[in-house]
Amino acid sequence: MNIFQLQSVGLSDNDKSILTDISFTVAEGERLTLVGPSGSGKSSILKLLAGLTSATSGTIFFQGRNIAELDMPTYRREVSYCFQQPVLFGQTVQDNLQFPFTIRQLAFDQTKALKALESVHLAPEFLSKKITELSGGEKQRVALIRNLLFEPKVLLLDEISAGLDAETKTIVNKLLADYQAAGNTLIEVTHDQSEIDAAQKILRIEGGRVQV
């Protein structure tokens, strides 16, 4: 079953074409990697899938439904976007992990959060650690598990391993492999060969088009 289907999707900004006639499918539980030169439109595709911007032509279907007709807050619990530069809030790690639950008036499960920290090799005391004290790799791990705590069906990853050291990259790749093994879907933009090798499908994007 396809979790995503893009049909002749286009995106433009002030008459400048960014994406042209983008068509592809993503199977449920698949790992898809988008590759290509910088500025080719890869990140724009992720933003369309995340509902952060709207296509100017064509249609994007999520589980058979046009995403333009879906309730976005509900959709974004199913489809979670991870930025290359982690966006963190508040003073502490716990503030960050709890924030999405607070704004949705949902209960925060601290035990689950501690297990998530452990899965990325961060000790329990990290919950009280200040964001300003975290390294770049630690910030990326916190941002990633914040997204995973909602148990989304799809993770959209925009070069999240860029700038990570080898040890942190290994930890993150293990977490992503476990996430996919549970039947979830990964769609990523990356230049990292180990991540490209882990994909079931690779699409090359050049000049705002899918190259075949």
Name each model-derived stretch.
Residues L144:
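Hydrophobic anchor residue at the start of the ABC signature
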Residues L155-D158:
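Catalytic Walker B motif of ABC-type/P-loop ATPase nucleotide-binding domains
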Residues F108-F126:
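Conserved ABC ATPase "signature" region
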Residues A50:
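Helix-to-loop junction immediately C-terminal to a conserved catalytic motif
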Residues A166-T168:
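Helix N-cap at the start of a conserved alpha-helix in ABC-type nucleotide-binding domains
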Residues K130-L134, E138:
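Conserved ABC ATPase signature
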Residues G58-N66, Y75:
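Conserved ABC transporter NBD signature motif
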